[in-house]
């Protein structure tokens, strides 16, 4: 059994055969068997829609679909017989995931799944939180609560509130943020910094702090990426509430980054520091000693830094963003040797090509993540280098990082081809991870919406099509961690879980939130509603820009406060002058695209 993704080129109803062409230009003849099923793409919580009786109307030239079937070797070739077909819309150029509300409804469903999985139907009590969640949403017996996974779920719940206005999601985000502050945060008053524990081990009424990482790659060290993602959820919550305690935590954690992780002379940030001296050059760090990597430099922007800037407009955040993006543009490309960026470095930026599991391998999604975030930054601080690198990545990635027959994006591949090889070899497998599909969708959506181009929009649609067809779990809820190359779910080991060290609603929610923003304001040109709930002690200037978007691409059209129209706002700068209040204000804004 295998999958073909492509576009109908012709259909012979009498013979029950149609031709389709893939993104690579290969043509396949598809035989429709009598027991073949056909359906319309559906979202989480939507019913199955049978399309079998409408095949003559739907198998028209240009229709985009997935076909799952069997290749039978026969004669000098093969016969491909379809067993399942999924149509992405009702006619050519029609994509269900571009309809208004698709990603909002998906995020609403995700939030409902994780709310039930972690807290059941009762009160929200983070003492019950578990890092590992089974396929069906059942909590495991593991009592280690990892800081980053809580923060990632908080991010998801905050994002769900921003799109739906459901107070329950904000309650979960705020309680999670407070739980992180109360249990996972260490305040070093002597050095005026904050850092975050790896997690806590909960046993009855007792908890044991886990200061250093328990993850194999980072064991007994303080990795930069764990400190970064500890800020993800609280920062997204800060955008909604303006809670000054959160902004203080952001600034004090950034002081940790500047004082102990930053390489002031050489540029960038080190990936790990030791837990005693807080030094990146201590021998106890072993293979992580004096190293820099993608996470330590590139993950600041999407995890918290862009959102901190959106919430405040403060120059210190923009300046750090510019520094990190300048560093990426200067040191990460390696196009004389590979179509993939290099991701690991020594202090002097020479390439570390033998580091643990990665060696000289590329994480496909990190390349796409660079393109996506460069285009975000380019809207605030335009630079030719940012735009050029983002466009280059967008152009060269599909043939080396994506599946040209089945759709979707691969995981980890060798950066170099050996003599005689035509394809970059897979590191371990040809499976496809949910978060890498997210990077592709967002990268090509923002490229399509900013620099334009039919190719970018086509790549965005193909990536979103694969994700929505194969990653949504219509039986248990939420999304799968990994699928096989064909799109079938891969349900072994930790990849069977819906919650783990690597998965806790963050990437799936980020995708829903930003796909809504980019699709509405840049692609289909539809209004976008967002919700905020600033505290009485928050700044009286509420910034409601949904992301770093090109100047003049949207404006603030309407504002409601506590359900009533409110007129004191700046349409062009997307800010609201809040009235004084002794209570939190419920603010709903509508943003509209500007042609």
Where are these regions (language model features)?
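Glycan-recognition and catalytic cores of secretory/periplasmic carbohydrate-active enzymes
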Residues: 1-595
């Amino acid at each position: 059994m295998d999958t073909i993704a492509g576009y109908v080129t012709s259909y012979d109803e009498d013979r029950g055969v149609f031709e389709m062409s893939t993104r690579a230009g290969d043509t396949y003849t598809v035989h429709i068997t009598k027991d073949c099923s056909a359906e319309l793409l559906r979202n989480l919580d939507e019913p199955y829609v049978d399309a079998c009786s409408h095949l003559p109307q739907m198998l028209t030239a240009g229709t985009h679909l997935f076909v799952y079937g069997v290749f039978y070797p026969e004669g000098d070739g093969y016969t491909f017989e379809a067993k399942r077909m999924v149509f992405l819309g009702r006619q050519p150029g029609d994509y269900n995931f571009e309809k208004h509300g698709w990603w909002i409804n998906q995020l609403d469903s995700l939030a409902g799944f994780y709310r039930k999985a972690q807290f059941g139907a009762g009160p929200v009590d983070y003492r019950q939180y578990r890092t590992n969640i089974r396929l069906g949403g059942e909590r495991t017996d593991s009592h280690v609560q990892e800081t980053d996974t809580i923060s990632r779920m908080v991010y998801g719940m905050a994002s769900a509130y921003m799109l739906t206005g459901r107070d329950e999601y904000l309650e979960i985000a705020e309680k999670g943020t407070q739980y992180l502050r109360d249990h996972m945060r260490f305040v070093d008053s002597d050095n005026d910094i904050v850092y975050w524990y790896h997690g806590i081990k909960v046993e009855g009424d007792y908890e044991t702090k886990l200061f250093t990482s328990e993850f194999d790659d980072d064991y007994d060290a303080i990795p930069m990426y764990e400190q970064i993602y500890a800020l993800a959820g609280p920062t997204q919550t800060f955008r909604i509430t303006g809670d000054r305690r959160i902004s203080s935590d952001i600034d004090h954690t950034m002081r940790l980054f500047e004082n102990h992780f930053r390489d002031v002379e050489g540029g960038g940030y080190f990936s790990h520091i030791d837990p005693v001296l807080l030094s990146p050059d201590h021998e106890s760090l072993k293979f992580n000693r004096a190293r820099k990597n993608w996470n330590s430099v590139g993950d600041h922007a999407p995890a918290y830094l862009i959102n901190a800037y959106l919430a405040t407009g403060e120059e210190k955040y923009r300046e750090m963003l510019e520094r990190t993006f300048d560093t990426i543009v200067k040191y990460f490309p390696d196009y004389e040797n590979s179509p993939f960026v290099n991701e690991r470095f020594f202090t002097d930026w020479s390439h570390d090509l033998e580091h643990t599991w990665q060696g000289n391998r590329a994480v496909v999604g990190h390349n796409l993540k660079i393109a996506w975030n460069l285009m975000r930054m380019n809207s605030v601080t335009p630079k030719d280098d940012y735009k050029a690198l983002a466009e280059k990545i967008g152009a060269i990635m599909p043939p080396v990082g994506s599946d040209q027959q089945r759709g979707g994006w691969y995981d980890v591949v060798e950066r170099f081809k050996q003599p005689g090889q035509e394809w970059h070899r897979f590191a371990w497998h040809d499976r496809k991870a949910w978060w890498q599909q997210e990077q592709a969708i967002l990268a090509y959506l923002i490229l399509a919406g900013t620099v334009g181009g039919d190719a970018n929009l086509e790549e965005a649609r193909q990536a979103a099509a694969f994700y929505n067809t194969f990653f949504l779990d219509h039986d248990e809820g939420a999304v799968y961690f990994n699928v096989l190359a064909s799109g079938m779910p891969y349900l072994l080991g930790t990849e069977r879980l819906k919650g783990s060290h690597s998965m806790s609603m963050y990437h799936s929610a980020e995708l829903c939130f930003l796909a809504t923003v980019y699709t509405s304001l840049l692609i289909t040109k539809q209004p976008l509603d967002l919700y905020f709930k600033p505290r009485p002690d928050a700044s009286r200037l509420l910034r409601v820009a949904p992301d770093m978007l090109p100047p003049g691409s949207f404006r603030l059209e309407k504002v409601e406060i506590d359900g009533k129209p409110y007129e004191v706002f700046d349409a062009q700068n997307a800010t609201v002058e809040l009235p004084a209040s002794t209570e939190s204000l419920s603010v709903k804004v509508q943003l509209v695209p500007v042609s």
